[in-house]
C-alpha cells in the first residue's frame, strides 16, 4: 500500500467518524456525544499503554443502561463504517491473485493447453454459503452501507464535499435510528433471504462473468476455444442443513429452493428486458436467420413499431415465457385473481438456452459477433451456471439421526430378520441388509406410506418429509437443485449406506451421498472406511456409474474442538494424504469438500492459500468450501470484492491441480515432524480441556450461555442439552472465545508442541531442529498457512482482556489456574512463531492487516468493556430487556470489527 492510499484510509475513517459523531450529538445530545468521545480517548490511552483496561471499565461500572446502550451502538456502527473504508481500499489495490496471473503462471511453468483444458472441462469449484448467528443485518442496513460507500468513492473522485457530507449525514441519521439486527430470533426464512441477498448484490453477475473469463483466458493464453462451461457453481446449506437444527423441515427446504428459483427467474426476466431494449436491429439494415424469424413470429409481438425488428420481437416472446416461470413460482395468494398468462413457461433451462442460441447463431452468421458477445453472452453464461435452480442446496444430517430413521422404516417394512431391531444388528449385518435393499428395485414401503400421518415418530416424519421435499425440488428445478446428501459424524460404512436407502425410496438415486469426517478419530479412519465401502461390488458399481468419482467432506470445526488447532490441521492433512493414496490405488477421482468456517479455529483463512496448502492430488480441479457469516459479507457484499475472491478461489484450484505446489525436499521427514508437533500439541490441548475446572471456566468466562439465549441465529447452540464440549456446536465454541478475545481454537498448544519438539534432542542439536522448522515454513505451503493463520488469530487476541473475563468465573482458584495456563501458552506460542518465521511481530508479513488492527483496537476495547460489565449485571439478575439487547449489540459489534470471529 502506498503512503497516499494509507493516508486516504485514515482520512476516510476520520470523515465517517466525524459525521457519526455529529449524528450522535444531534440525536442523543451533547452529553452522550461527550461520553462516547471520553470512552474513545480512554481506549486510545489503553491501546498506547497509558492506561489499563480496568480504567475503561470504570466508565461503565455505574452508568445507566440507556447510555451504555448508546455507547455500544456508537462503537458497533463505527466498526461497520471502518469495514466500508477498508473494503473500498482493498478494491483500489491490485489483487495479489488473479486469473490473469494464474494463467500466465501456468503458461510460464510449461502446462500444456491439453492439460489445462482437461482440468477446466471437469472442474467444479463451489463456494457454499451457510448461515451464521452474527450475520443478521437487515437489507435496509446493507443498502445504506452501499450508498455510504458510493459517497466515499465520489469524494475520492473530486465530488463536492459539502454535498457529499450532507448526504452522509442524512444516511447516517437514518442508519443510527435503524436497528442493525432484528429484535426477534431470525427464522430460517430470514437466513435464507440473507443468503440470497448476496446473489442480488454480486454473485448473479460475477459468477457467470468469472466462468466467461476462464474461457477468455484459455483462448488468450493457450489459443484454445472452449465451449460454454461453468467451472464455478455456487451451493448453499441454508434451509437444507438440519444437523442439530430442529427448525429445518420440508417447508424450509421448499422455501429455500423456490426462493432461489424465483431469484434467478426474475434475474432472467430483468436481463431479457435489457436485451430487448438493446437489440434494436432493423431488417432494413441487417439480416437474420430463418430460425430467428420463426422465433420472432411465434412471440405474439405484432406491434407496428416493431415490424422491422425481429430480434426485439423474439426476445419479447422469450421474456413473456420467462415471466410465466416467475408467475408459476409466486405463492398462490399473490397470483389469486390475476389473469393467467397465455405464455407457456420454459420447462427446462436447456429449452431456454436453445432459444438464446437461436439469437446467438443468427447474430454471428451476420457479422454481429460484437453484439452476441455482450449481454446475450452474459445471459447464456448465467443459464449455464445457474440453470433454473440458482444454487445446489445440500441436505445435511448426522449419522445418528439417519440410523434412527432407517430403524423405523425397516421396522414398518418388517425388513430386519429374526424380529430384531435394526440398531441391534452388528455392523456387518447392517451393511448386508442395506445393500440388499439398495439392490432391490421395489420400494420398501407401499406408495404414499411416507406421507401417512402418524405412521412414524415426529422426528422420522420430519426427516422423511425433507427427503420428499427434496425429490419435489428436483422434479421442479432439475437434478442440480439437490445434488448432495452429507452425513455428519460418519464413522462406519453403514452410516454412508443408510441415507442411500432413504434417497432410493423417494426416487433420488442420483444424489451424491457424501461422508463427512470431522472428529480426529474419524479423520484417521476415513480412508479405511472408504476402502471397506469400495470392497462391496454393489457400491463399486455405483461409483463406476458416476464416473468413478467419490466425494468426501472434511470437517474443520469439530476436529479443532476435538483435538485443538495443530492436531486438527494435521489430522485433516494426513486424512487427505490417505484418501489421495487410496483413490490413486483404486483409480477413483477424489472430490473434496471442506467444511470451513470464517474463523481460523474453524478452518478459516485466505481461500487461495488454503487450497494451495492441500496435498498434491487432493484438488484435481474440483473443490467445495463452505463460506459463512462475516466472511460472506466481506467477500460478497460488493461486486468488486466478490470478483477478487472468486478469482482467488478458482486460481487456487487451477494452480493446485496443474502445478507442483508442494516442493518439500524430504516429505517423509516433514510429515514425521508434523506428527510429533500434532501429538505434542494435542496433549497440551487435552490438559487444558480435561482440567476439572475447564467447563466452569469456559462457560463463565465467555458469553456462551448468552449466545444461546439472545436470539443469535436460528440454530440452537448445542446439538444436545448437555454441558459436554463434544455436544456444543462449533460456532458458539469459537464465537465465545473470540468475544472474550482469547481465541483459543486458533493457537492453543502450538507453543508447547514446538518447545517439546526442540527440547527432545540434546542442547547441541536444538538449533538444527529450529532450522528444520524454519525450512518447512519457507518451503511448505501447508506449514506456512498453518503458522500464518495462527498469527492472524493471535494478533486479534488480547490476553489482558481475557484476564478480566476470567474474573467472571465464580471460583477464583479455577479462574487463576486456567487463565495462567492460557496466558503461559499464549506467550510460548508467540515466541515460537517469531523464532520460526524470523518476524518481529505477529503481523509483520501483512502490513495492511497490521494497520487495520492498529486502527480497530481502540474501538474494540469499549465493546469488550461494556460486554464485561453487562455480563456481570445480567448474570447477577438484571434481566432488563435493554441489558440483554446491549450484550447482543456488543457481540455483533465485536464480530463485525473482528470480521472472522466465529
Swiss-Prot record:
Q: What is the lineage of its organism?
A: Bacteria, Bacillati, Actinomycetota, Actinomycetes, Mycobacteriales
Q: Which UniProt keywords apply?
A: Carbon dioxide fixation, Lyase, Magnesium
- Give the CC-aspect GO terms: cytosol
What does this protein do, in the record's words? Forms oxaloacetate, a four-carbon dicarboxylic acid source for the tricarboxylic acid cycle.
Could you tell me what this protein is called? Phosphoenolpyruvate carboxylase
Question: Known SUPFAM superfamilies for this protein?
Answer: Phosphoenolpyruvate/pyruvate domain
Which protein family is named in the record?
Answer: Belongs to the PEPCase type 1 family.
Could you say which cofactors this protein requires?
Answer: Mg(2+)
Show the stretches that span the lipid bilayer: none
Give the E.C. number(s): 4.1.1.31
Q: Name one GO biological process term.
A: carbon fixation
Amino acid at each position: 500500500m502506498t503512503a497516499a492510499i494509507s493516508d486516504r484510509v485514515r482520512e476516510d475513517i476520520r470523515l465517517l467518524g466525524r459525521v457519526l459523531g455529529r449524528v450522535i450529538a444531534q440525536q442523543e445530545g451533547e452529553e452522550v456525544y461527550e461520553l462516547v468521545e471520553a470512552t474513545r480517548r480512554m481506549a486510545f490511552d489503553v491501546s498506547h499503554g497509558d492506561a489499563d483496561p480496568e480504567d475503561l471499565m470504570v466508565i461503565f461500572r455505574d452508568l445507566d443502561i440507556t447510555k451504555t446502550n448508546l455507547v455500544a451502538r456508537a462503537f458497533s456502527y463505527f466498526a461497520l463504517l471502518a469495514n466500508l473504508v477498508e473494503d473500498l481500499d482493498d478494491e483500489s489495490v491490485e489483487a495479489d491473485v488473479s486469473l490473469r496471473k494464474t494463467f500466465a503462471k501456468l503458461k510460464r511453468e510449461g502446462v500444456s493447453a491439453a492439460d489445462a483444458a482437461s482440468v477446466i472441462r471437469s472442474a467444479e469449484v463451489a463456494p457454499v454459503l451457510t448461515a451464521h448467528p452474527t450475520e443478521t443485518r437487515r437489507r435496509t442496513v446493507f443498502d445504506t452501507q452501499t450508498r455510504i460507500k458510493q459517497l466515499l468513492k465520489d469524494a475520492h473522485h473530486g465530488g463536492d464535499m459539502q454535498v457529499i457530507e450532507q448526504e452522509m449525514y442524512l444516511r447516517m441519521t437514518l442508519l443510527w435510528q435503524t436497528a442493525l439486527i432484528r429484535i426477534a430470533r431470525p427464522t430460517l426464512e430470514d437466513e435464507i433471504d440473507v443468503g440470497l441477498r448476496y446473489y442480488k448484490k454480486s454473485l448473479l453477475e460475477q459468477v457467470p462473468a468469472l466462468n466467461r473469463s476462464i474461457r477468455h483466458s484459455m483462448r488468450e493464453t493457450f489459443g484454445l476455444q472452449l465451449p460454454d462451461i461453468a467451472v464455478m457453481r455456487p451451493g448453499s446449506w441454508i434451509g437444507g442443513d438440519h444437523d442439530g437444527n430442529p427448525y429445518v423441515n420440508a417447508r424450509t427446504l421448499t422455501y429455500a429452493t423456490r426462493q432461489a428459483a424465483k431469484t434467478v427467474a426474475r434475474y432472467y426476466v430483468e436481463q431479457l428486458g435489457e436485451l430487448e431494449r438493446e437489440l434494436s436491429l432493423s431488417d432494413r439494415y441487417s439480416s437474420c436467420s430463418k430460425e430467428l424469424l420463426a422465433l420472432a413470429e411465434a412471440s405474439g409481438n405484432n406491434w407496428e413499431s416493431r415490424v422491422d425488428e425481429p430480434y426485439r420481437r423474439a426476445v419479447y416472446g422469450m421474456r413473456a415465457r420467462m415471466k410465466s416461470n416467475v408467475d408459476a413460482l409466486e405463492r398462490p395468494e399473490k397470483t389469486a385473481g390475476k389473469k393467467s398468462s397465455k405464455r407457456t413457461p420454459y420447462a427446462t433451462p436447456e429449452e431456454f438456452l436453445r432459444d438464446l442460441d437461436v439469437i446467438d447463431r443468427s447474430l454471428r452468421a451476420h457479422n454481429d459477433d460484437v453484439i452476441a458477445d455482450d449481454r446475450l453472452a452474459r445471459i447464456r453464461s448465467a443459464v449455464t451456471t445457474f440453470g433454473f435452480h440458482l444454487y445446489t442446496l445440500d441436505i445435511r444430517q448426522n449419522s445418528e439421526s439417519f440410523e434412527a430413521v432407517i430403524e423405523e422404516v425397516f421396522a414398518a417394512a418388517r425388513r430386519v430378520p429374526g424380529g430384531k431391531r435394526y440398531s441391534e444388528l452388528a455392523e456387518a449385518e447392517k451393511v448386508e441388509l442395506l445393500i440388499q435393499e439398495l439392490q432391490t428395485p421395489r420400494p420398501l414401503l407401499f406408495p404414499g406410506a411416507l406421507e401417512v400421518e402418524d405412521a412414524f415418530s415426529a422426528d422420522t416424519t420430519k426427516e422423511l418429509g425433507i427427503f420428499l421435499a427434496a425429490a419435489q425440488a428436483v422434479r421442479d428445478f432439475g437434478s442440480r437443485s439437490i445434488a448432495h446428501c452429507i452425513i455428519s459424524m460418519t464413522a462406519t460404512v453403514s452410516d454412508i449406506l443408510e441415507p442411500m436407502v432413504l434417497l432410493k425410496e423417494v426416487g433420488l438415486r442420483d444424489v451424491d451421498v457424501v461422508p463427512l469426517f470431522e472428529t480426529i478419530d474419524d479423520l484417521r479412519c476415513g480412508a479405511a472406511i472408504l476402502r471397506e465401502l469400495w470392497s462391496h461390488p454393489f457400491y463399486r458399481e455405483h461409483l463406476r456409474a458416476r464416473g468413478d468419482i467419490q466425494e468426501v467432506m472434511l470437517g474443520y470445526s469439530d476436529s479443532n474442538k476435538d483435538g485443538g488447532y495443530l492436531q486438527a490441521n494435521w489430522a485433516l492433512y494426513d486424512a487427505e494424504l490417505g484418501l489421495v493414496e487410496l483413490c490413486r490405488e483404486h483409480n477413483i477421482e477424489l472430490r473434496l469438500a471442506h467444511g470451513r468456517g470464517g474463523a481460523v479455529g474453524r478452518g478459516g483463512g485466505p481461500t487461495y492459500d488454503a487450497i494451495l496448502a492441500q496435498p498434491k492430488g487432493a484438488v484435481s480441479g474440483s473443490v467445495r468450501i463452505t463460506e459463512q457469516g462475516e466472511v460472506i459479507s466481506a467477500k460478497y457484499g460488493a461486486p468488486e470484492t466478490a470478483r477478487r475472491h472468486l478469482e482467488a478461489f478458482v486460481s487456487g484450484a487451477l494452480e493446485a491441480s496443474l502445478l507442483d505446489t508442494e516442493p518439500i525436499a524430504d516429505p517423509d521427514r516433514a510429515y514425521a515432524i508434523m506428527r510429533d508437533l500434532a501429538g505434542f500439541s494435542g496433549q497440551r490441548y487435552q490438559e487444558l480441556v480435561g482440567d476439572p475446572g475447564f467447563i466452569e471456566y469456559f462457560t463463565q468466562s465467555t458469553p456462551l450461555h448468552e449466545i444461546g439465549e439472545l436470539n443469535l441465529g436460528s440454530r440452537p447452540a448445542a446439538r444436545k442439552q448437555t454441558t459436554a464440549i463434544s455436544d456444543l456446536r462449533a460456532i458458539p465454541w469459537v464465537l465465545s472465545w473470540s468475544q472474550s478475545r482469547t481465541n483459543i481454537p486458533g493457537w492453543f498448544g502450538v507453543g508447547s508442541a514446538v518447545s517439546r519438539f526442540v527440547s527432545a534432542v540434546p542442547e547441541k542439536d536444538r538449533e538444527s531442529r529450529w532450522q528444520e522448522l524454519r525450512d518447512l515454513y519457507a518451503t511448505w505451503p501447508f506449514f506456512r498457512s498453518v503458522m500464518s493463520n495462527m498469527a492472524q488469530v493471535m494478533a486479534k487476541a488480547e490476553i489482558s482482556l481475557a484476564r478480566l473475563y476470567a474474573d467472571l468465573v465464580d471460583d477464583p482458584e479455577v479462574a487463576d489456574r486456567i487463565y495462567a495456563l492460557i496466558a503461559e501458552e499464549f506467550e510460548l506460542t508467540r515466541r515460537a512463531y517469531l523464532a520460526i518465521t524470523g518476524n518481529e511481530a505477529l503481523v509483520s508479513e501483512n502490513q495492511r492487516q497490521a494497520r487495520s488492527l492498529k486502527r480497530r483496537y481502540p474501538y474494540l476495547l469499549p465493546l469488550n468493556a461494556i460486554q464485561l460489565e453487562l455480563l456481570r449485571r445480567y448474570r447477577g439478575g438484571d434481566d432488563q430487556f435493554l441489558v440483554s439487547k446491549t450484550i447482543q449489540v456488543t457481540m455483533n459489534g465485536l464480530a463485525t470489527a473482528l470480521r472472522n470471529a466465529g
